[in-house]
């Protein structure tokens, strides 16, 4: 804040008094710019300076009992942050045209993340990865492998700017989601959030539309029946993934506004796809997947609540 202009007259006239007794005290106030993520919003916490964890690396409750040692690798693959990070890293690298390298990637990450997988388990992981690579995605109806043949980005990091002058309007966010059938219960913390950060696992283009794909290693159970579309939808509600998906699509919405001269959300936003990897099985092709598309007016409304015009 700038101080008021000084009076003229060299300090000797009647109009000039002792500044120590009459001048107002001018103070400059600095409001910190804080950053948050989807996971931090759910914890009602602000991440100060430490690097953001990818959303998949945030620990979630794993209540299902352990599978028998001889069960399918989908159910015996280790749970937790490190195994999830390792699987995401492999999925970022593999493509149909580098099939001969998959085993090398698995062995490398098995050592790096200290997963302790035996050679027979790595064999099973290769078969599992093949099922994932060739499964049909729920919105675009192409395979994951095919989605990597055209324009795409893996691990696409983004930062959403919000209005620096006011606190993030948590009640408005809750009301916006409730009005569209996805009630949230975020706590109204009066935080001055300047940035929301995140990372999209896989962003790709198909037939002129842009799709968001997110991988989940959540363990929902030890049988195919635990990964039906109905159970996937329930799990997404339990973990507030509707919010995560919406933030991802707002980020894509803002990106395309700057890249496409003829951008039209109804024409270019292709939808959001979630793969619950432990449920991907050719014997049960409908399992482990969930996809939908928010209406353009929902994304535009959330964008306004986040303060895009003032950001």
Residue ranges and their predicted role:
Residues 1-311:
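Structural signature of nuclease core domains in nucleic-acid processing machines
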């Amino acid at each position: 804040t700038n101080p008021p202009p000084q009076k003229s007259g060299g300090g000797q006239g009647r109009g000039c008094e002792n500044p120590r007794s009459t001048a107002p005290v001018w103070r400059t106030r600095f409001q910190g710019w804080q950053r948050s993520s989807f996971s931090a919003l759910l914890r009602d916490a602000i991440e100060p300076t430490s690097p953001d964890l990818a959303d998949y690396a945030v620990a979630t409750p794993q209540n299902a009992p352990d599978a028998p040692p001889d069960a399918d690798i989908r159910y015996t693959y280790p749970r937790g942050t490190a195994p999830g990070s390792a699987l995401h890293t492999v999925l970022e690298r593999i493509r149909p045209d580098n099939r001969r390298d998959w085993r090398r990637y698995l062995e490398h990450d098995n050592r790096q993340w200290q997963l302790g997988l035996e050679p027979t388990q790595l064999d099973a992981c290769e078969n599992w990865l093949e099922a994932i690579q060739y499964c049909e995605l729920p919105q675009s109806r192409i395979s994951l492998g095919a989605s990597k043949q055209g324009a795409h980005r893996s691990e696409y990091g983004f930062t959403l700017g919000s209005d620096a002058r006011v606190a993030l309007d948590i009640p408005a966010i809750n009301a916006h989601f409730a009005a569209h059938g996805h009630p949230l219960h975020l706590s109204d913390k009066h935080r001055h959030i300047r940035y929301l950060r995140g990372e999209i696992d896989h962003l790709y283009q198909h037939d002129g539309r842009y799709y968001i794909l997110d991988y989940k290693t959540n363990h929902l159970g030890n049988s195919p029946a635990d990964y039906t579309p109905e159970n996937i939808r329930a799990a997404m509600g339990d973990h507030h993934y509707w919010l995560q998906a919406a933030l991802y699509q707002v980020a894509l919405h803002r990106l395309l506004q700057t890249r496409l001269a003829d951008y039209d959300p109804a024409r270019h936003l292709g939808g959001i796809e979630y793969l619950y990897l432990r449920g991907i099985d050719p014997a049960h092709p409908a399992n482990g997947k969930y996809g939908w598309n928010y209406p353009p007016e929902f994304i535009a409304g959330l964008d306004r609540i986040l303060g895009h015009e003032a950001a």
